[in-house]
A protein has these predicted regions:
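Interhelical loop and adjacent transmembrane-helix boundary motif
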Residues: 143-195
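Generic hydrophobic transmembrane alpha-helix motif, especially the helices
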Residues: 43-77
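Hydrophobic alpha-helical elements at and bordering transmembrane segments
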Residues: 4, 8, 38-45, 85, ...
């Protein structure tokens, strides 16, 4: 149980920080076509790397600690949040943006009242992906010695008699992911209803 809480804590912290960074960077880059192309290229490039690659530089800089894993989680999980935020904001029809500008709203008001609500479904899809990426990287982080469910999973998989334990631990990780996904979906659906989105 304590290992499950550590896993949930590390994944949750990673998701919160990754989502904050991803939505901020995505919102800024979506305002400019060149910045959009550059950030999407960066996201595509980072997604081609194997997940273990993210652990190497942080291990060199910070050593074999939970901090290293958290930094790797944040870097890895920021990618979908950034990508889906950019794509969501770029998908807002220009006619609605022009209508907002003609109504006298400034850029910040247009972003808050028009662009973000319409991009909301895309952004929440990105947050869901961020949760999955964060959980995945936390489990991978067990290879460098984190004290979470991932370590038990690795031990179970290396033991011929540990198949049942490995399956049970895998289900625990899946349950954490499903619980977070359900919470996000419930909140997202409520926000859609409030904003009048389909």
């Amino acid at each position: 149980w304590d290992r499950a809480l550590i896993t949930a804590y590390m994944a949750s912290f990673g998701v919160i920080v990754s989502a904050t960074i991803g939505i901020t960077v995505g919102s800024l880059c979506a305002q400019n076509r060149l910045a959009t192309k550059i950030i999407l290229l960066v996201c595509d490039t980072f997604q081609t790397f194997p997940s273990f690659v993210y652990l190497i530089p942080v291990m060199i800089l910070f050593g074999v600690t939970d901090t290293s894993v958290l930094i790797a989680v944040i870097v890895y999980a920021t990618i979908p949040a950034t990508r889906y935020t950019v794509e969501g904001l770029r998908s807002v029809p220009e006619s609605l943006q022009d209508a907002g500008s003609m109504s006298g709203v400034n850029r910040l008001q247009r972003w808050i009242k028009i662009e973000m609500p319409l991009a909301f479904p895309h952004i929440m899809l990105g947050i869901n992906q961020t949760v999955i990426f964060a959980l995945f990287m936390v489990i991978i982080g067990a290879f460098i010695g984190t004290e979470d469910l991932g370590q038990f999973i690795i031990k179970a998989l290396s033991d011929k008699q540990g198949i049942g334990n490995g399956l049970l631990l895998g289900l625990c990780v899946a349950a954490i992911g499903l619980a977070v996904d359900h919470l996000i979906q419930t909140w997202a659906n409520e926000r859609k209803r409030v904003l009048g989105l389909p």
